[in-house]
Amino acid sequence: MDFIKSAASFIAKAGSQFPYDLNEKIPLSSNSVWTLQTGSIRESAQPCSVFSISLSTHPEWAELADRACETMKTLRHPCIIKYLSTYKSSTHLYIATETVRPVTTELNELSAEIKTYGLWRVSAALSFLNDKNIVHGNLQMSSVYLNSADEWIIGDFFLAGDSPQFIKDNHDKILNWSRLVPFEIQSSTLNSASFIYLDSYELGKFISHLYNGTPGDLSQRGNIPANIFVSAKKLLNVEGKQKLLASEFLKLGERPGGFFRTHLITLYELLSEVRINEEEDRVKLKQLLSSKLEVIPKNYIQKVVLNILFLLLSIDTHSDVVELLFKCAQIVKGRPDIEKDFGVPLLSLLKQQSVPIRGLLLSGIINNPDVLPKNIYEDTSFSVFANLVRSNSPTLKEHAIVVFSIIAPKLSKKTLNNELLRSLAVVQNDQHPTLRTNSTICLGKIAEYLDASVRKPVLAAALSRSLKDPFVPAREAALKVLLSVQNYFDTKDVAIKLFPSVVPLLIDENEGIRRTAEDVTDQFLSRIKNFNLGEKENVSAPAKFNGSFWSKFIHSSSASPSPSIDMKKESLELKNDTTEIKEKKNSKSRVVGNTENSKDEFNNPLFETEEQIDESWMENWNDEEETENNVEESWGL
């Protein structure tokens, strides 16, 4: 028993020292000695890939594996696999790197344009190594990987170094030396100056494999692009003036009009170098992104493009940046880590940036509600939106109200029935009439999601207050909402709480309000009559309101930019006749609207706006009125 306890203790101790949590295995080529697994570093929880090799099973690979590890430690380049850490036991060597997967498993699915981009990165990696007098010596398709952003990177540095003899002595362990390397290199005097062409030769074989599926000798072009084929053949030359180094091949491709001067590679260069300070670069970047989004890998969009666009918003406040941002979000919505890559920076910008940028972001949310990740709906995130309705900007308030109606169904009950309603109550007391109107419309939209214990008192208090609003559309909205939510109330509540608030509107100065109030009172009286006749009540959630009233919020003429909102893709028709509003301050008459001349009165400039309406009514309520309306102002919350 003591022995078993000791063994268990030893295993537990060894396990606690192991620095990685290992997950699923990633298939590699049949000739690979590596085992590749996804995982994470225990200490930091950083996601990673873990390459491991059994030193007991493959003792002949011990020196090569150590060499690969040491080389990776010293190299830092965007096109070379990023080393994180190493762990070595008596039987295994483990190397943790950035998250990668082999390109071989996806090669057949890649377009020629993406393959050319990959060739550009592989050539850049070899050029970097050769400039440092390092020969990779093992370039083949199985030594090329894709990172989490789908960027092509090279690894497998078993032979890398400046020792031609070491490469020749050990190359057969990886691939047959005589089959891969031309006779001239095999028989020539071994020196670094000539041996560096080994990488060029392997690059030529790689190009054949990349486009044609097998590492041939380039005697036939096959699917290799014609402008690449001519230069690629020179990579296989060993003697004479026609031979090319990998760095020379790269320069040929990158010169003006070269085979690496594609729009996609230019876009990648702009993104990788974060060249956004110059207006010319920003315009070029936006144009290329707009035209190439469909061919850019989704991982790259999520890990790189989104980040650059969020950064770009700090400099470029044009709406086309936000449009691109949400186009990208549409492409990668629902993917793993989207909360971190899109949700977190979005919330951060909504907290910190200027009013125009926050307005544009809110407009993007309104027009693309399906892209929002889960963390947008968390209780801790709602404070970002709640603070917007307490800002000094009518634009932000207007947008925030619409966002409330979008996110309400997915909020927790606690946030919905408390924080969101408190925020709407604040807006209903706002000095801007369109905002007060929109708060009522929003309340009607979210009523079905509220708890029953909260819904009735909130609706009664809020609508009673809105029915007294001097702004015609506000009263119209309150009547429409009241009509649509009446089934939440039993007949006694209708008679006692709702009916008395509607009756004064039967003699309203606005003919449209009077007509709507008549419709409401007729329905209420019909319910009361049926109740008195003893008919059974059916108090339940109201049927979905199909009228055009629900399709849009109204807009403030002073708020710019106004959100482009079409919640149900319907036209909005609020039927108001020409109306005169008598003001307490200057007793001037104003035309409110005429349905004969407008099909969308909520957006029509004939509607009263903040600049047109006299707000002195808010200051001139007497103490008695204030006392009576305390409950209405706070909605009883």
Swiss-Prot record:
PANTHER family registered for this protein in UniProt: N-TERMINAL KINASE-LIKE PROTEIN (PTHR12984:SF3), SCY1-RELATED S/T PROTEIN KINASE-LIKE (PTHR12984)
Coarse class of the protein's main subcellular location: Golgi
GO terms assigned for molecular function: ATP binding; protein kinase activity
Localization per Swiss-Prot or TrEMBL: Golgi apparatus
Notes concerning its domains: The protein kinase domain is predicted to be catalytically inactive.
Location of the region described as Disordered in the Swiss-Prot/TrEMBL record: 576-637
Domain of life: Eukaryota
HEAT repeat positions: 414-450
InterPro entries, A to Z: ARM-like (IPR011989), ARM-type_fold (IPR016024), CIK-Related_Protein (IPR051177), Kinase-like_dom_sf (IPR011009), Prot_kinase_dom (IPR000719), Ser-Thr/Tyr_kinase_cat_dom (IPR001245)
Any one of the GO CC terms: Golgi apparatus
Record-given protein name: Protein kinase domain-containing protein ppk3
SUPFAM superfamilies named among the record's database cross-references: ARM repeat (SSF48371), Protein kinase-like (PK-like) (SSF56112)
Domain Protein kinase: 1-296
Biased composition (Acidic residues): 608-631
Amino acid composition bias (Basic and acidic residues), ranges on this chain: 576-586
Biological process according to GO: tRNA export from nucleus
UniProt keywords, alphabetically: Golgi apparatus
